[in-house]
């Protein structure tokens, strides 16, 4: 797995590689649907939002498949491309939605994904 998350929440990965993204800090006494989305620099959604429902747990894991990360293109003239991601936790019983802050971020901060071009085509 080549997905790396640094201390400020920036994700680095190779295009087309898989990885797991673990989100913690949920209230284990509540039911949630948690969403993960990636956008380009123009705020266009890349692929579909991923969603996971969880009950009685303070963590949820998103599986980033090779097909999903392959949507993150790196232009040939660039060594990498930057995308942005967001995570939202929605309480199922109360219809409350909260965008989650990653690491020490706050309003206006962007959660970055640095995507490097494929090294090997694979399957």
Give residue ranges: language-model regions:
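Contiguous segments within soluble domain cores/interaction surfaces
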Residues: 1-123
